[in-house]
């Protein structure tokens, strides 16, 4: 039903064809980008669905599906948070109007009071899970934690297992951040990563290999050139490093960690903090 304040006219709006309500734990009206929407959650497949009223006069509704990858097994989470009983934690999915955007919030909370927000991650519309960022300002959390970076760590542990042989790490020197635009890399670490790179030869390394470096926290990516130097037989990130350095605001003394995701053939920046519980 709709009510026009100016004309004081009441009209009936034909609702969308919804699936069997018994499949869902929750159905509610909400707001999506200023439009009336119906949200269904809790069908057990790590997803929820929204029907948005596009045109009240024509009774036109659009549908959006938020499919959440099942990366919340919670065993690494329970381990890191030192929770005694994994069964005390449940997954919940909801759309929260307080975000002020058309994003959806996924959170995991204890099944019984007190309800502390254990972690949350915002899922961009039309994803799934294209962008990750924290929702700390919305909730009162019961511990000191940087939510967005902790979520990234959990995903890494689940999807990539954080193989130490696939990580290149370095504390930046003055030479790394000066105007020459080169990052000198630890030789042994690069050699370890090269074992997982396809079709890499000494000749191609001398010429330079173009690689992608992804910042999954900010949803940015950079194109860099990995090269070996003939004179010293060591490795550098050459072209592209300067742009990446300035974009990330890296300074002398900062640590940079790059994880080689050999399945997707790209580096992932691991610059997150490990301070979980005081």
Swiss-Prot record:
First-listed, main subcellular location of the protein, grouped into a coarse class: nucleus
Highest taxon listed in the record's lineage: Eukaryota
Pfam families per record: FBA_3
CDD domains documented for this protein: B3_DNA
Cellular location(s): Nucleus
Keyword check for Cell wall biogenesis/degradation: no
Gene3D superfamilies, per the entry: DNA-binding pseudobarrel domain
Keyword Disulfide bond applies: no
Organism annotation: Arabidopsis thaliana
Listed name of the protein: Putative B3 domain-containing protein At2g21920
GO MF annotation terms: DNA binding
Keywords: DNA-binding, Nucleus, Transcription, Transcription regulation
UniProt-listed InterPro entries: B3_DNA-bd, B3_domain, DNA-bd_pseudobarrel_sf, F-box-assoc_dom_typ3
